């Protein structure tokens, strides 16, 4: 008897389900179809064997990519090896994707089945999945599916920004539109300004130069010898500048008002700015083509190569086209008209704008266009699928087209393709090595800058952290200094007079010398951490009941006195003991005198 298990892939994890044991799987089809919508009936046929949830969204994305590519992920392998029976011949595993089924059968040895009753079971599992798995709600399952769908689509749409061909498509389309607009606007400026200065149209043929001159001259009656140098800069020809100056003096144009001149100058400036932008866009297109398709650019030119890519939709689509399609790309109307009327098909499309077909004789135009389309197809495939694109192959292919042209004209036999490609391979390897070396240098420089930046950030953070403890110490020292005076006020609050306090105060002022003050300051800084802790605890723990004890405490809390014989480097505890003993002697003398 065959045991049927079904593998279901969900955004939250893998689920392995088992069906009730029957001798023939086909007998399950009507029962499953009836019970798909009813959860109770579906539970009687299908039960959940194991569920393997994904640890994170990244793991879910990895598993989704593996399933789409037909690869058995480690999580799926662990689930199947753990929960499927060891006797593989008695197990039939149902899967929804034939690719993953073939991979499981090849790697793990389980018999896999798709379609038929498996599709109906998976439909029911998809409908009741949140009820089969404990702790899973319909809302959380939908959120997981939405998040995984966005991540999966983002990974599929992601592309390399350095070799994007969509920018080329938009640039060449905008360039063609700008050419039409600049031509139309220039003709409008010629017609508008021609009423005032009609002779300028015959002298200047270039549209951009004409608009610059119309903007500069303005009223022709104000043109004089002082502006001749500027005219030479604009026309880049001294004879034309002199002719413009002479024509302005004897022009047959009508006079024009100031407001009309302002409008003409404003429109001329717009046309000039459009022409300048057109030049910058053309430079941008050339740089992009050298990055994306260097071989195609070297072979047929940047403009024609960009039009081929734009017409095909992408560089990948152009690489997939055969040479016969590349030859007539852009001449679809003529092709279908010829097929409809059973006439001659076109010989060339967009590649007609290359210089090779124009240089060929009329009888050789078809032959050279076919040869050029063949080389364009090869160049586009090299650019599309090479890891480090270089222009070496495009230059060699261009040399071959030149040799073919000379062969048609003079009969000189060109070199063999095998020899040319061998030379190109050697040069391409050298160029690729040079490019990789430059990229490695740039990466090293970038890493050095990153390390310096991180080191500067770490240094700044360490300086900030080192400054904060000092501030905390300063804040903690201030209340400690205030607490030194508190024990002196205790005897006064209790109503007791201490003779040692009144007796010792004038002696302190007389007995301290400069050396003793210096030594006491040094000892206070050395023992600032240990002594204040003792002072802090004494007033809280003990109360003053005897004037003698109060005298002893007040004497011990006063500033420490050191004799000149004692060294400055003595410890803080010894200094405290000596000062307290001296104060005891003074206290006894005062009591005897009383």
From Swiss-Prot:
The modification Omega-N-methylarginine is found at residue 359. GO terms for molecular function: cadherin binding; histone methyltransferase binding; RNA binding; snoRNA binding. There is a cross-link at residues 87, 230, 240, 540, 564 (Glycyl lysine isopeptide (Lys-Gly) (interchain with G-Cter in SUMO2)). The modification Phosphoserine is found at residues 314, 466-467, 511, 519-520, 537, 563, 569-570, 579, 581. It holds the Pfam family NOP5NT. It comes from the Eukaryota. PROSITE patterns: NOP. Residues 458-469, 488-504 have a biased composition (Low complexity). The modification Phosphothreonine is found at residue 468. Signal peptide: none annotated. This is Nucleolar protein 56. The lineage of its organism: Eukaryota, Metazoa, Chordata, Craniata, Vertebrata. The gene is NOP56.
């Amino acid at each position: 008897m065959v045991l049927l298990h079904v593998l279901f892939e969900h955004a939250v994890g893998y689920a392995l389900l088992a069906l009730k044991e029957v001798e023939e799987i086909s007998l399950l089809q009507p029962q499953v179809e009836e019970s798909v919508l009813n959860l109770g009936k579906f539970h009687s046929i299908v039960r959940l064997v194991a569920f393997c949830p994904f640890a994170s969204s990244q793991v879910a994305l990895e598993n989704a990519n593996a399933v789409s590519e037909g690869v058995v992920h480690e999580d799926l392998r662990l689930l199947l090896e753990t929960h499927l029976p060891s006797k593989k011949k008695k197990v039939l595993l149902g899967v929804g994707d034939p690719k993953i089924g073939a991979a499981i059968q090849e790697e793990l040895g389980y018999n896999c089945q798709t379609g038929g009753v498996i599709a109906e079971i998976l439909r029911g599992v998809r409908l009741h999945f949140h009820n089969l798995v404990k702790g899973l709600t319909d809302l959380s399952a939908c959120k997981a599916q939405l998040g995984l769908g966005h991540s999966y689509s983002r990974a599929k749409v992601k592309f390399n920004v350095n070799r994007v061909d969509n920018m080329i498509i938009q640039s060449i389309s905008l360039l063609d539109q700008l050419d039409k607009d600049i031509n139309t606007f220039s003709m409008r400026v010629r017609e508008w300004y021609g009423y005032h200065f009609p002779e300028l149209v015959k002298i200047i043929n270039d549209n951009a130069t004409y608009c610059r001159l119309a903007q500069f001259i303005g009223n022709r009656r104000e043109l004089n010898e002082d502006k001749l140098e500027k005219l030479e800069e604009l026309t880049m020809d001294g004879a034309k500048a002199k002719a413009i100056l002479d024509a302005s003096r004897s022009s047959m144009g009508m006079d024009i008002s100031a407001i009309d001149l302002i409008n003409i100058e404003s429109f001329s400036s717009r046309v000039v700015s459009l022409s300048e932008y057109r030049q910058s866009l053309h430079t941008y297109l050339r740089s992009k083509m050298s990055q994306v398709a260097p071989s195609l650019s070297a072979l047929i030119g940047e403009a024609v190569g960009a039009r081929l890519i734009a017409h095909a939709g992408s560089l990948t689509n152009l690489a997939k086209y055969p040479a016969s399609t590349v030859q007539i790309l852009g001449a679809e109307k003529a092709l279908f008209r010829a097929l409809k009327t059973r006439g001659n098909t076109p010989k060339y499309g967009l590649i007609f704008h290359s210089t090779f077909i124009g240089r060929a004789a009329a009888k050789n135009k078809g032959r050279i266009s076919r040869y050029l389309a063949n080389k364009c197809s090869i160049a586009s495939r090299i650019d599309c699928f090479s890891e480090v694109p270089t222009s070496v192959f495009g230059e060699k292919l261009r040399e071959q087209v030149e040799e073919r042209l000379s062969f048609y004209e003079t009969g000189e036999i060109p070199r063999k393709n095998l020899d040319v490609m061998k030379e190109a391979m050697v040069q391409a390897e050298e160029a690729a090595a040079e490019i990789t070396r430059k990229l490695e240098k740039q990466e090293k420089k970038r890493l050095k800058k990153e390390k310096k930046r991180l080191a500067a950030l770490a240094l700044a953070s360490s300086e900030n952290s080192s400054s904060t403890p000092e501030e905390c110490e300063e804040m903690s020292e201030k209340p400690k200094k205030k607490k030194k005076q508190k024990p002196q006020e205790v005897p006064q609050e209790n109503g007791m007079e201490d003779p040692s306090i009144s007796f010792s105060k004038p002696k302190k002022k007389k007995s301290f010398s400069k050396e003793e003050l210096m030594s006491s300051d040094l000892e206070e800084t050395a023992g600032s951490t240990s002594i204040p802790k003792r002072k802090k605890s004494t007033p809280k723990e003990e109360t003053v009941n005897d004037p003698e004890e109060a005298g002893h405490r007040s004497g011990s809390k006063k500033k420490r006195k050191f004799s000149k014989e004692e060294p400055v480097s003595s410890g803080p505890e010894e200094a405290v003991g000596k000062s307290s003993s001296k104060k005891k002697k003074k206290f006894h003398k005062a009591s005897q005198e009383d």
